[in-house]
Amino acid sequence: MKKAMRSILVIIACCFVLNSAAQKTIDTIATKVDGFDIPIRIKLPKNTTGKNPVYFFVHGGGWNGGTATSVPPARLSTDANYLANQLGVIYVGLAYRCKGNNATFADAIQDLEASVQWFFENADTYNADLTRIGFGGSSAGSTLAAMMAQKYKNCKLFVGAEGMYNLVEHSEERSTFPSQKARELYGLATEKESKKASAFYNL
């Protein structure tokens, strides 16, 4: 009985190891800013040769979250497995400081730029083709991702879901996000700040 039990445990352990290896998801710290670790999550494609394109994903959440000691985690969207395993895309989840970190939109952009730069510097480790990169995001993350996409000449793709790209002409009658309170808390209270954070005005 004990021998059979040990065999079962060995099989389970092997399955876990193989599954973990197959997933090829890497979690690490890309940079440290003002005492905060900025994490990054990388989903590598399986069974590819040569260099692969890169897709940077910025999570949503209304710029909420974060504490006095940590930022919200880097996350992958539901399409990560398909893009990585079926299309050979390196899928990179980015993190950034939010309102709970007493941060601003400009701080978030700084975090994202630092994380992307870290990935660029480690591109050879992940067999990344930096001539083919794209950005995307959901909701509040899409607003940030749109700004990021405009910063890199090798960006070939932008995918935004339910983002806000013109914060200057925004009104709560059109959309409840971001609320006036959220704008004030995240450094978007003035027209100058809103214009600087609007992809529409940075084309």
Segments and roles (model prediction):
Residues G62-S70, Y91, W118:
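Serine-hydrolase catalytic-loop signature spanning alpha/beta hydrolases and amidase-signature enzymes
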Residues G61, A95-K99, M164:
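Short beta-to-alpha linker loops that shape the active-site pocket of alpha/beta-hydrolase fold enzymes
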Residues M1-K24:
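Bacterial Sec-dependent N-terminal signal peptides
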Residues K51-G62:
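Short beta-strand element of the alpha/beta-hydrolase
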Residues A22-T49:
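N-terminal cap/lid segment of alpha/beta-hydrolase-fold proteins
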Residues A114-R174:
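Primarily recognizes the serine-hydrolase "nucleophile elbow" in alpha/beta-hydrolase
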Residues G163-M164, V168-N202:
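Mobile cap/lid helix-loop segments that gate and shape the active-site cleft of serine hydrolases
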Residues T69-V92:
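Short amphipathic alpha-helix adjacent to the substrate-entry channel of hydrolases
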